[in-house]
Regions:
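Cofactor-binding active-site loop characterized by glycine-rich and histidine/acidic residues
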Residues: 40-107
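Cofactor-pocket helix-loop regions in the catalytic cores of large enzyme subunits
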Residues: 26-29, 33, 38-45
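Cofactor-/ligand-binding subdomain signature composed of acidic, glycine-rich
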Residues: 1-32
């Protein structure tokens, strides 16, 4: 589901689809952190709230600020960076925190 997901389509997902999406986000975050390092618990704990934000707000027009960035992995996955997520925190890869020059979704 995550591979072809566009951020704006989350608003049209059913409850069951959102549950499947959350499961997939947790799996991808877990697998990536086990390989690349990073913050696991804080990101797993923020999956449902991040999906809820995408189902209500209009990103990237609306902005979200993470207090320390340790909960942004699901946000990165949902905002068009799923294809590059396996490069998390690697040289030349995506950042482990929100970074304005990485995406219009980050502020």
């Amino acid at each position: 589901m995550l591979k072809n997901l566009q951020p704006e389509t989350i608003k049209n997902c059913t409850g069951n689809e959102l549950n499947v999406l959350c499961d997939e986000l947790r799996r991808v975050i877990y697998e990536t952190v086990m390989q690349c390092g990073g913050h696991l618990a804080s990101n797993l704990g923020a999956v449902e709230s991040t999906v809820a934000l995408f189902s209500v707000f209009d990103f990237p027009k609306d902005k979200i600020v993470f207090d320390v960035g340790h909960q942004c992995y699901a946000y990165k996955l949902l905002s068009g960076r799923a294809e590059r997520f396996s490069t998390l925190r690697l040289a030349g890869g995506i950042s482990g925190f929100p970074k304005r020059n990485e995406s219009v979704y980050d502020c």
